[in-house]
C-alpha cells in the first residue's frame, strides 16, 4: 500500500511540475530542446509516415523516398491515411511502394499495429517521419515496442515552424506532448530517455 501511495505521489508531482513548466515564460524557448531530437536521415529498410498531419509529413516522406533512402513507405493512422497516400502519389511515390495501416489512433497503436507488418517484411531498420514536437515520444515508443529494429527519426521541413502560425501551433502541440510523455512513462513504461542509435 505504501509503495502505491508513493507512486501516486510521484505521478502527481510530475504532472504538477509539467503544468508549471507549461505556464512558465521559459516554455516557448525551452520546448525545442526538450522534445526535438537531432534528425537522422540514413538509409533504412523502410520509411514510417506517422498520421496526425496531412501536409508536411507526407511531403517529407516522399522526399526521402525520392532520395533513395528507403524502397517503401508504411503509412499508419486511421484519421488521414487516405489523404497521406494521395499526397505521396502526387509527389511521385508509386502505389506499389506504399503500405497502409489504417486502424491506429495513438502513437502507441502506430507501433503495435505496425509491428506484425514490419516483422512479416523482415524490416530491421526504419526511418520515422513526424513533426518536431513529436520526435522524442515517437522514437521512444517505437524503440520500446520493437527493440530489435534500428529506428532513426527525422522531422518535417522546419520552414513551416518558423512562420507565426507554425510557431503558435507548435507551442500548443508541445504543451500537450509534454503531458503525453509523462502519461506514457507512467502508464505504459515508455521512458523518454532514448537508447543510442546503433
Regions found by a protein language model. Name each.
Residues 18-168:
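A structural signal for short, hydrophobic/glycine-enriched beta-strand patches
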Residues 9-13, 64, 144, 187:
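Enrichment for repetitive, rod-forming helical segments
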Residues 166-197:
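A transmembrane-helix-recognition feature enriched in membrane-embedded lipid enzymes
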Residues 6-22:
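Hydrophobic membrane-insertion alpha-helices, especially the h-region
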Residues 15, 26, 179-180:
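Alpha-helical structural elements
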Residues 1-4:
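Positively charged n-region of N-terminal signal peptides that target proteins for export
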Amino acid at each position: 500500500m505504501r509503495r502505491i501511495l508513493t507512486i501516486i505521489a510521484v505521478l502527481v508531482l510530475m504532472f504538477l511540475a509539467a503544468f508549471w513548466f507549461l505556464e512558465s515564460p521559459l516554455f516557448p524557448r525551452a520546448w525545442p530542446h526538450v522534445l526535438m531530437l537531432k534528425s537522422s536521415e540514413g538509409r533504412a529498410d523502410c520509411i514510417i509516415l506517422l498520421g496526425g498531419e496531412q501536409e508536411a509529413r507526407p511531403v517529407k516522406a516522399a522526399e526521402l523516398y525520392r532520395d533513395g533512402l528507403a524502397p517503401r513507405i508504411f503509412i499508419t493512422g486511421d484519421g488521414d491515411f487516405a489523404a497521406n497516400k494521395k499526397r505521396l502519389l502526387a509527389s511521385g511515390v508509386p502505389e506499389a511502394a506504399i503500405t497502409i495501416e489504417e486502424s491506429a489512433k495513438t502513437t502507441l497503436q502506430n507501433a503495435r499495429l505496425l509491428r506484425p507488418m514490419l516483422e512479416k517484411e523482415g524490416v530491421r531498420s526504419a526511418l520515422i517521419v513526424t513533426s518536431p514536437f513529436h520526435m522524442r515520444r515517437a522514437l521512444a515508443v517505437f524503440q520500446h515496442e520493437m527493440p530489435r529494429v534500428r529506428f532513426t527519426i527525422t522531422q518535417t521541413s522546419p520552414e513551416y515552424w518558423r512562420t507565426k502560425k507554425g510557431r503558435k501551433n507548435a507551442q500548443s502541440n508541445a504543451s500537450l506532448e509534454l503531458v503525453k510523455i509523462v502519461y506514457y512513462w507512467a502508464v505504459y513504461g515508455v521512458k523518454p530517455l532514448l537508447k543510442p542509435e546503433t
